[in-house]
Amino acid sequence: MANLSFDRLKPVLHAVTIIALAGCSGVDTNHPAIGRTVGNLPLVALADPERPAPAFAGKVTLLNFWGTWCPPCRRELPGLARLAARLADDARFQLVAVSCGGGGPDDLAEITATTAEFLESQRLALDAWADPDGMARTILAASFGFGAYPTTYLIGPDATVRAVWTGYRSRDEADMAAAVVSLLKEVPARAPPADR
């Protein structure tokens, strides 16, 4: 049996530490995305692939990239689902939860099945999206960096990024909810439809 020295284990311990810290970093107030505009992204609705990709202008959006394979993502998702349920009747808000595979382009059928199975097993009522060819992540990475799961962008009604959360911390749900509610003040309430 080989004797493993501490010096030989340093690179492994360093990598494990980086991965662990990525999973618990929380809101990033200096993220390069803050203040930048997010254009349309080539996303596919898992429930209806013919549905148009979400538009960000005019709404407050939480754009979340997560994966069923990612433990911090699985811990964060129930909080996002609770927030989306709480604001379900407010047309000024949308949660765009993008389910991502473990690496490379995602097979749409596989990601749809895996995501549906996960959401059902967790009893999460969530409208999930996919980035099957990885283009949305490529666009975001080229524009202002993307590299950890989960990553959540808070996008204002002017389609600019207002906050970014990378990784997961238990208080993120409350922080995200407060940020969303505050940002909703920038979007006029829509009048209910008139009776005919």
Where are these regions (language model features)?
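A short beta-strand-turn-helix
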Residues: 40-61, 84
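Conserved redox-active cysteine motifs that mediate thiol-disulfide chemistry
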Residues: 65-82, 107
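Thiol-based oxidoreductase modules, predominantly thioredoxin-like and allied folds used
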Residues: 91-109, 124-134
